[in-house]
Amino acid sequence: AIDLRGHGESEAAKTMRWNRIADYVDDVSHAVEIIGGKPILVGHSMGGFICQHISHRNEPVSGIALLASAPHYGVWRLVFRMLVKDPLALILSFAKLSLLPVIRSTHAIRDMFLDANTPDPKVKAFGAKLIDESFLAFLDMLLLDLPKRAATIPPMLVIGGEKDTVCLPSEQQSLADYYGVACHIIEDAPHNLMSQTKWQEAADKLAEWVETRA
């Protein structure tokens, strides 16, 4: 797995708040160069958005899989849903230039990321691992730096979760239609479909597709 700057074990070249999507795209491009060959990229959520940027940079990749990815037209629909669902959290996010207010409660974390029946202790343990994201990168995904579709793109796959409230199944289908590729929606899966109860089904779909790229 690739740790973007300021994430995981990677060092931060600057304060997280000032990272841009273009910075993260550069991180992935650098990783592809180091790995060599033609790797397959798998991007989840914002990672999928970054991979879409990679798709038109002629990087030497043999395929790109988008898992519960932010759509090509940006996350403005998500912002609207947040405004309806929890307007105070959204106002605080913009006031503080931070996304942490959006995940300030156990209910919000479960609703956005996890299976609906996840017990509170597990939700809290998951929430303790969450870090703030660059607000500039969020604005890039909202409007400022949307990915462009290249004339020629690498083979792609889109996988979404039926119960995803962050990147809706309909948005995943629109994303797949935009790139002219297959879309698979995993029944009952939330946004973090790769780590919840339906992870095996998502992994199997991904593995089947990867085998076609071998």
Predicted regions span which residues?
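Conserved alpha/beta-hydrolase
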Residues: 1-13
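Conserved acidic catalytic loop of the alpha/beta-hydrolase fold
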Residues: 23-39
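Conserved hydrolase catalytic core segment
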Residues: 38-75
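Flexible "cap/lid" loop of the alpha/beta hydrolase fold
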Residues: 65-94, 137-138
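Conserved alpha/beta-hydrolase catalytic His-Asp/Glu region
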Residues: 100-138
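Short beta-strand/loop motif that positions the catalytic acidic residue
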Residues: 152, 158-160, 164
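Conserved alpha/beta-hydrolase "acid-adjacent" motif
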Residues: 165-174
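Catalytic active-site module of serine/aspartate enzymes centered on a nucleophile-bearing elbow/loop
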Residues: 182-214
